[in-house]
From Swiss-Prot:
One of its GO terms (biological process) is pyrroloquinoline quinone biosynthetic process. The gene is pqqD2. It comes from Pseudomonas putida (strain ATCC 47054 / DSM 6125 / CFBP 8728 / NCIMB 11950 / KT2440). Belongs to the PqqD family. This is PqqA binding protein 2. The keyword Transcription does not apply. Functions as a PqqA binding protein and presents PqqA to PqqE, in the pyrroloquinoline quinone (PQQ) biosynthetic pathway.
Length: 90
């Protein structure tokens, strides 16, 4: 069961910044205490969270970018639940 509201607009948590780390070729979350390296799919999801687009819109954009990926919606929702639990998003 997913607890993320598809009509909600999410954004990065306070004090976090999403950036690209060219030396490691990955997205990273920067915060006052350090850095979190993200896998590619986490970076793609987080870069779409602008505080205005709904979760449903983010999923639609990802589905357009990556057509025919089975379980994409469920995977995105599961990731967002984890990200919210870690206070990466609000």
């Amino acid at each position: 069961m997913n607890l993320i509201d598809r009509q909600q607009a999410l954004a990065l948590g306070r004090g976090l910044r999403l950036d690209w780390e060219p030396r490691k070729a990955c997205h990273v979350l920067l915060y006052a205490g350090g850095i979190i390296e993200l896998n590619a799919s986490a970076g793609w999801v987080l870069e779409l969270l602008d505080g205005h687009s709904t979760v449903a819109t983010v999923i639609d954009r990802l589905a357009q970018r990556f057509p025919n990926v089975p379980g994409l919606e469920e995977d995105v929702l599961a990731f967002l639940e984890v990200a919210r639990a870690k206070s990466w998003i609000e």
